[in-house]
Regions:
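N-terminal secretory signal peptides
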Residues: 1-23, 47
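Conserved C-terminal helix/tail region of periplasmic/extracytoplasmic solute-binding proteins
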Residues: 9, 363-444
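N-terminal export leaders
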Residues: 20-40
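Signal peptide processing junction and immediate N-terminal pro/mature segment
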Residues: 40-49
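Short, glycine-/small- and polar/acidic-enriched structural segments
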Residues: 49-211, 215-218, 230-244, 251-264, ...
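Ligand-binding pocket segment of bilobal, Venus flytrap-like solute-binding proteins
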Residues: 112-114, 212-254, 273, 305, ...
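Short glycine- and hydrophobic/aromatic-rich loop-to-beta-strand nucleating segment
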Residues: 152-153, 269-272, 276-277
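Secondary-structure end/capping motifs
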Residues: 280-392
């Protein structure tokens, strides 16, 4: 009998329950190697119940802003591939309107499956409020991408005023400008989005009606600085690097960071088409785990300089790295002589439960969109939040990532939130919050 035949006979002996000790040891070693490889590819037992993601890729959109860093890092550092998703494409979008349109299309229609997105947008898209013919496209929020990190900037024509949280001097200046026959405008990035709500809140708190006293216009983030340069607007709200670039080009200055309006406020989310998540739940979990791991990496201060360098690359934001680095590392030069080192309002990707999508925060965004007429007063916010906000998937992913139980919120609410002007939002009574606001488009 040949050696080959003997080796084959030995391997088949297990069928008779007579595997030799040597064969058993070899088989055990092989199994251990396979398990080790599986753990390396899918740490935390993410796919212990199956063979891994149903598909190897997804198309994810982003806008050229620093709070998309977790997507950049997950791609650059091979984290998507680590979780079995090597074919993920992270695609730049020209505007939030483009992001919306491509989410409606889905990747099967040459669009995208998910995105770095303004937190209110999945609700506006799911409800059909901002889609063509008001046809809803169901969306899920899988994670929050960051807290804080946005700013409101004003043009250098207001340099002497050194405008900050108090808009009283700005109001007087705007009234004088309007009286001279000139238009006054405030720019944001998408109607009903976070930047729209921050600048509206700030203006209204100081008695400036954002619909009557000033014209509120939409400008894509990457076009903010160029538009301010030619005098298109008097103020704008956007994420970095555009506020710092404005200062570097001597076109304007930072009036305030949005964290000064609302400390540790939620900002962007990782949103996915519900159809993708429902069809490919394991792939969606893999994407979520990769993004969460990237958030943890971005949060570490020792990684912030590299995060800034990644952001500055041509395929991502495409700006000089000096427009990114300081604020990514927590240094805020307002362009007025005011400099804050290690700002408490710097962007957070993981610390302070930045990644968990509190449902109470989504309720605030919807309540503000009711305030400004994006939804009717009787809109059923809690019902749509229950459908769109998938904090349950976040918790599941967090457990498989090994996140400590103490770092996984026990409640879907962060409780009452207090704003810079003393207003309090109680998620148990949003109607009372609406009633407390003076300037609004809804009776409450």
């Amino acid at each position: 009998m040949s050696k080959t035949t003997k080796r084959g006979k030995g391997a088949l002996a297990a069928a008779d329950g007579k595997m030799s000790r040597r064969a058993l040891l070899k088989a055990g070693a092989g199994t251990a190697a396979l398990l080790a490889a599986a753990r390396m590819n899918f740490p935390g037992g993410a796919f212990a119940q199956g063979a891994g993601p149903e598909v190897k890729g997804a198309k994810l959109g982003f806008i050229a802003l620093t709070d998309a860093s977790p997507l950049f890092v997950a791609k650059e550092k091979g984290i998507f591939a680590k979780y079995g998703m090597p074919d993920v494409e992270v695609q730049k979008q020209a505007s939030w309107g483009t992001t919306r349109d491509n989410l409606v299309l889905g990747s099967e229609g040459n669009g995208i499956d998910g995105a770095h997105i303004l937190t209110p947008m999945p609700y506006l898209i799911s409800s059909g409020k901002v889609t063509q013919n008001n046809v809803p496209t169901p969306m899920y929020i899988l994670a929050r991408l960051n807290l804080n990190g946005q700013c409101i900037s004003v043009g250098k024509e207001y340099a002497d005023l050194k405008i900050g949280l108090d808009t009283a001097p700005f109001k007087v200046a705007l009234e004088k400008k309007k009286a001279s026959g000139k238009s006054v405008k405030a720019a944001m990035t998408f109607p009903g989005g976070t930047h729209d709500l921050w600048i509206r809140y700030w203006l209204a708190a100081g008695g400036i009606d954002p619909d009557k006293d000033i014209e509120t216009i939409v400008v894509p983030p990457a076009q903010m600085v160029a538009n301010m340069k030619v005098g298109t607007m008097d103020a704008f709200c956007v994420c970095e690097p555009w506020n710092l670039q404005l200062i570097h080009q001597n076109i304007g200055y930072t009036a305030l960071t949005t964290g000064e309006l609302w400390d540790k406020h939620p900002e962007k989310s990782f949103g996915m088409r519900a159809a993708y998540v429902d069809k490919y739940p394991k792939a969606a979990k893999a994407l979520l785990m990769a993004v969460m791991e990237a958030q943890q990496w971005c949060e570490k201060m020792e990684n912030r300089e590299e995060t800034a360098a990644i952001c500055a690359k041509r395929q991502w934001i495409n700006v000089p790295v000096e427009d990114v680095t300081d604020r990514m590392k927590g240094k805020f030069d307002y362009g007025t002589g005011r400099v804050v080192e290690n700002s408490p309002q710097q962007m957070r990707f993981w610390k302070d439960q930045a990644s968990y999508p509190f449902q109470s925060h989504d309720l605030w965004f919807i309540t503000e969109d009711i305030r400004w007429g994006k939804y009717d007063a009787g809109f059923d916010a809690k019902s749509i939040i229950a459908k769109v906000n998938r904090e349950d998937l976040w918790k599941d992913a967090a457990k498989d990532l090994g996140v400590a139980a103490a770092d996984i919120p026990a409640s879907t609410s962060r409780g009452k939130e207090t704003f810079f002007d003393g207003k309090v939002f109680d998620p148990e009574n949003p109607a009372a919050y609406l009633k407390s606001l003076t300037i609004k488009r809804v009776e409450a």
